[in-house]
Amino acid sequence: MNIQALINDKVSQALEAAGAPAGSPAAVRQSAKIQFGDYQANGVMGVAKKLGTNPREFAQKVIDVLDLDGIAEKVEIAGPGFINIFLDKSWLAARAEEALTDDRIGVAAEKQQNIVVDYSAPNVAKEMHVGHLRSTIIGDAVVRTLEFLGHNVVRANHIGDWGTQFGMLIANLERVQNETGEVSMELADLEGFYRESKKLYDEDEEFAVRARAFVVKLQSGDEYCAEMWKKLVDVTMVQNQINYDRLNVSLTRDNVMGESMYNYMLPGIVADLKEKGLAVESDGAQVVFLDEYKNKDGDPMGVIIQKRDGGFLYTTTDIACAKYRFEQLNADRVLYFIDSRQHQHLMQAWSIVRKAGYVPEEVTLEHHAFGMMLGKDGRPFKTRAGGTVRLADLLDESEVRAAKLIEAKNPDLDTAEKDKIAKTVAMAAVKYADLSKHRTTDYIFDWDNMLAFEGNTAPYMQYAYTRVASIFKRADVNLADLTHPIVINDEKEQALLSTLLQFEEAVLNVSREGQPHLMCTYLFELAGKFSSFYEACPILNAEEAVKQSRLKLALLTAKTIKQGLDLLGIETLERM
């Protein structure tokens, strides 16, 4: 249940009834401190200013017509005109009882939309590196959240599977085949193979001529080139899938929608943009001039969509991509989880898309940009030698470090269980360290912090779940055995319950903002509220009615943490 939305509607109605213009914002927010109630309506002062009336007097008028019977225990004016709302304990308890017996723990499904989410997007013939981590796991957390809310989500892995580099790769494949009769198709070999191909292309003119010829052949549908290209894609995606599976990322080969997928659309798009008068010839190239973007001379910036040699650009592909997602996938909303450095490029492509009428304004095109992963020196995360860190190497190191941690914490566990726990904690630590940071900011990657059992970390959250779940196990009862209702007698109980019932608000915030850190913040706060409750309120030793009430709170906490972590793509453990 979205309590914030419920109260916001009630306050909005009261504002209008008190004389505010229709549509005046109630601005209901969760209260920062318990002494200010559960929710606070902050819109009164702005409305009072427009009406030219005293904010506190107007706030009283709003309260006089505010219908929160049975929902709020008390409503009071604070400061210059804030309205503090204290929810009724019995009403909260009833909502918790409903959530306990609901598979969705009280979260309502939204009206279904078709939502395309573009994320991960590694390049073919190269191994995934740490630069791919943020797009992959942030995008996947949002995908899981949107699906949980009932939307039809299309995962779009826009891999880099096209371009002139394939000419040099195929030329080198042919050379090796001619010399040895076979070609290794392991991605680790391909990484070196790529560098070798580039060196040959730069230093051997005869090789470069052959490479350029292969580009033309590939674009013309040559059978041999198409076969070699497909092998390169297949080998790359097999290795990428290993990384996805290790990270518990929901992408599969079926979700690949690479650059090449839109090739057939590109000539038609250029022709259509010319016909619409949007594209004009400039120095032999086809260019769209955008008035909203100026060059250094103050003139409209030209965006090239076809080079003078007839070749197309990334912008042309992105125009086609947006058009396809609306026309063929019936998208209501398209989310791109792409590096912040691509922002202007995307905005220009989408400007052309809108001007051409390919995607109507009611369909949102959203760039959810993200910052960089930095080392402790504040520079882009690199190996000691200054090279790019392979994602697989990062995950391997995380497993080694987690294994040492689990061995120190629980040396008596059998080897198989320690290994399972270490792998689960390792992947969770890498993901949560990233997901818990604001998406748009850079963050420092720190092994010690991310594997700590204190603070807003994966090990802390996984342990919090294990601890809560173990209480219910020790009680040795099922939910059906708990016949006594939830009754709130302690402020720690109320603080926990109020936070538990804000889960839907956290889910909706992630879905709307594309910000998984909001879920991490919520779960960390929830774990803290449970810890305070557990210290202040005995559970198993309490008298039966109180014991059952508190066991229900513990169970709802465990279910909520588990569901929240699952939306982040993080697995829980029954013991650590």
UniProtKB/Swiss-Prot annotation:
UniProt-recorded Gene Ontology molecular function terms: arginine-tRNA ligase activity; ATP binding
EC number: 6.1.1.19
Gene3D superfamilies per the UniProt record, alphabetical: Arginyl tRNA synthetase N-terminal domain, HUPs, Isoleucyl-tRNA Synthetase, Domain 1
CDD domains linked: Anticodon_Ia_Arg, ArgRS_core
InterPro entries: aa-tRNA-synth_I_CS, Arg-tRNA-ligase, Arg-tRNA-synth_N, Arg-tRNA-synth_N_sf, ArgRS_core, DALR_anticod-bd, Rossmann-like_a/b/a_fold, tRNAsynth_Ia_anticodon-bd
Subcellular location(s) per record: Cytoplasm
GO BP annotations listed: arginyl-tRNA aminoacylation
Catalytic activity: tRNA(Arg) + L-arginine + ATP = L-arginyl-tRNA(Arg) + AMP + diphosphate
Cellular compartments per GO CC: cytoplasm
EC class (word): ligase
Alphabetically ordered keywords of this record: Aminoacyl-tRNA synthetase, ATP-binding, Cytoplasm, Ligase, Nucleotide-binding, Protein biosynthesis
A Pfam family matched in the record: Arg_tRNA_synt_N
Annotated motif 'HIGH' region, positions: 122-132
Domain of life: Bacteria
Family to which this protein belongs: Belongs to the class-I aminoacyl-tRNA synthetase family.
Assembly behavior: Monomer.
Record-given protein name: Arginine--tRNA ligase
Organism listed in the record: Photobacterium profundum (strain SS9)
Organism taxonomic ancestry: Bacteria, Pseudomonadati, Pseudomonadota, Gammaproteobacteria, Vibrionales
Gene behind this protein: argS
